[in-house]
Amino acid sequence: MSTDNKQSLSAITLAAIGVVYGDIGTSPLYTLRECLSGQFGFGVERDAVFGFLSLIFWLLIFVVSIKYLTFVMRADNAGEGGILTLMSLAGRNTSARMTSTLVIMGLIGGSFFYGEVVITPAISVMSAIEGLEIVAPELDTWVVPLSIIVLTLLFMIQKHGTGMVGKLFAPIMLTWFLILAGLGLRSIIANPDVLHALNPMWAAKFFLEYKTVSFIALGAVVLSITGVEALYADMGHFGKLPIRLAWFSVVLPSLTLNYFGQGALLLKHPEAIKNPFFLLAPEWALIPLLILAALATVIASQAVISGVFSLTRQAVRLGYLSPMRIIHTSEMESGQIYIPFVNWMLYFAVVIVIVSFERSSNLAAAYGIAVTGTMVLTSILSTTVARKNWHWNKYFVALILVAFLCVDVPLFSANLDKLLSGGWLPLTLGIVMFIIMTTWKSERFRLLRRMHEHGNSLEALIASLEKSPPVRVPGTAVYMSRALNVIPFALLHNLKHNKVLHERVILLTLRTEDAPYVHNVRRVQIEQLSPTFWRVVASYGWRETPNVEEVFHRCGLEGLSCRMMETSFFMSHESLILGKRPWYLRLRGKLYLLLQRNALRAPDQFEIPPNRVIELGTQVEI
């Protein structure tokens, strides 16, 4: 490898440390404290400490190192990852019924992510701010207001983009991981006996000794791997090699040293269980560590916020969420986006969670169900890809699936015990998002089918218009068409009511491909249907935002000249009426009407100059 390539790999690896590992990297703030806080019926005992440390270490090895970094990250769509990408890949070579099942799984996984992102900023920032209690116990009443202030500032800067701030993420997180390692190593040197917990037999002994209680305690252990989905979801930003290199060279050693350092401290000073992370540090270092922890948790929260923006754009482009305003905050990086509606809805949800739960330890009970539920679905979808797309041996794939589920299912089941104490929160949010996504998709399909029931052939209409043309007026008219070979409603209504047609007519269809990006060479396809009619199909990936001005610039390069300010864009605006339905479908219909009313209008969605748009209304019963 050349020197330049090595430097580039080092830079990307450093950047991956700053973005990908923020969530899992701040887990030491609260994980071991929750494991040994006494809620499971045992205190800081040697066997319990060794058992939890062994479980945490081997979860990091099996779930993160083996399952995600080695297996799941093999499943990419043009380098992109994430649960919806996995859903798309898994459904490519399967039957229609199987594809429907896989789509439902993918949507549930995506919905769980929305439930998780409400909790991550709250628990991360609160855990860091709670370090104030070690410095000055009388400041404990300031934890909630300070957490809200920090997160308010974070959500307010989202509209300015994170490009400049992002440059600071990597060095701050690298410093964070080095401090984690240093604090842990210092404690381990003072009590090296704790390293015996690396032996997986301590995990086995933990289950044998504590039986049912040990199973329930898995709900706390899983806190050590929250954020693992980010490794796969952010694969498109950094690539597989940098993410893997960052994990094995920096993140895994640092996390292991810190967890075992906390364990060594607790074996000598059980009273440190009130906050073992901050008590690892010497007294003089508490305030700098508190500041660094606050910065690290803000970075972890930023990564989650950026993730929900990306997931939302993907869901919108794939037709599972209604169109909404998406702002690009960087001219250089297409992945840096800001969605105002999502930003402020997430902010208010996070503030409500902080005020309601008050302590990170209370919020820990809500964490885990969404994470482990997504892990189960990822196992099923990724092994489906291995069998159907990679054509691996079915017995080998079955063995892999069983191995994954033997870990994922117990973790998910253990977290169900948290349902009444907070686990209902991400589950409820996930269910709400699942209902919204499936409602939009199914009702949108019903609407389009209803609109296209007129049965007229596009070819027949064009032939008729060319043979017996109506009054033709100068200029170019563009009619947005949702599907090929379907007559746009706006065209029918223009002919019916205005009885005129422009000299040149373009039927424009914007299509979302099953890929993150579409090369400019394949962006536009032009077909002349008659002397005065053209069909233009513009293809975009689900990580791209359609732009009509760009489309016609490409058309001009291919011989179909079209000036935006001399062109009229005709669009149909549907006024929807609910027909007779069963009560449950009527409720879904009302939800769809609400979503439709608040959806971004097509001119804004496709960046068409407002003064060039003509909307023709039509009433449709669904």
From Swiss-Prot:
The keyword Protein transport does not apply. Its main location: membrane. The chain crosses the membrane at residues 9-29, 49-69, 103-123, 137-157, 165-185, 213-233, 247-267, 276-296, 337-357, 363-383, 396-416, 419-439. One of its GO terms (cellular component) is plasma membrane. HAMAP family: Kup (MF_01522). Keywords: Cell inner membrane, Cell membrane, Ion transport, Membrane, Potassium, Potassium transport, Symport, Transmembrane, Transmembrane helix, Transport. NCBIfam families: kup, PRK10745.1. This is Low affinity potassium transport system protein Kup.
